[in-house]
Design a protein with these regions (language model features):
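A short, highly charged nucleic-acid-interacting micro-segment common to nuclease
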Residues: 1-11, 29-32
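A short, glycine/Asx- and small/polar-enriched loop/turn
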Residues: 35-39
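A short acidic/basic microdomain associated with nuclease active sites
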Residues: 18-34
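Acidic, metal/cofactor-coordinating or nucleic-acid-engaging core segments within structured domains
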Residues: 70-152, 156, 161-165
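Intrinsically disordered, low-complexity linker/loop segments enriched in Gly/Pro
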Residues: 7-22
Length: 212
């Protein structure tokens, strides 16, 4: 269940921060809640750094930050292995069978040319969302602060000290150095309690299904 909420957050961040529209997502490919789709957690297409870009996203929510990064990179690596061409072709084919409503006719035609092999003029980007538990967040709530800005400043300092960039870099160098030549854009969300957060998101989206 965590994966579904992660996919929703991934979609929000990619469209909100990178301005790359979603072309299809795994949730929409399922015929019923028990179906399991072995693919990316979201496909996006748009302009990034001035070039046409295909985004293949991953969303992970883990208790441990390092585990979340490792699993996200492992999932991303599937699109650059021995059978990556076939896998990527499958992603595009399935996505075109369930395009997002926000795609214009022109973009749908362009995407069609991508998976038919008529055009390869695009770059690939991997937007990656990792939600993780941070035990220190509870402590921040017990300290007195003069105002909200002081709390924000302290949280920002704490996240900087977590050194997320180094954690990603170390994981890449140890097991996935070949991924360094590709665009990888990480979005991190520290959580006090992952399961509680997931339930809150579920309650906000589907209030009538929440257990009390």
């Amino acid at each position: 269940m965590d994966g579904k909420r992660g996919e929703l957050i991934l979609f929000t961040m990619v469209e909100g921060f990178l301005d790359i529209p979603m072309m299809s997502h795994k949730l929409g490919w399922k015929q019923n809640p028990t179906d399991q789709i072995k693919g990316s957690d979201g496909l996006f297409f748009g302009e990034y750094e001035g070039s046409p870009t295909l985004g293949i996203g991953e969303a992970k929510m883990y208790t441990d930050l390092d585990d979340g990064i490792e699993e996200a990179l492992d999932s991303t690596d599937r699109f650059h292995g021995e059978d990556s061409q076939l896998r990527n072709q499958h992603e595009l084919t399935v996505a075109m069978g369930n395009p997002s409503d926000n795609l214009s006719k022109e973009k749908i035609e362009l995407l069609s040319s991508l998976f038919t092999g008529e055009s390869q003029d695009y770059q690939m980007l991997h937007p990656i969302f990792v939600g993780y538990e941070d035990d220190d967040l509870e402590e921040f709530q017990t300290k007195p602060y003069e105002d909200d800005q002081e709390l924000v400043d302290q949280l920002q300092k704490h996240i900087e000290e977590t050194d997320l960039l180094s954690k990603v870099t170390d994981s890449l160098e140890e097991d996935y150095s070949h991924l360094r030549k590709h665009w990888l854009t990480f979005f991190f969300l520290p959580l006090e309690d992952k399961d509680h957060f997931v339930e809150n998101v579920k309650a906000a989206i589907y209030p009538w299904t929440t257990n009390h």
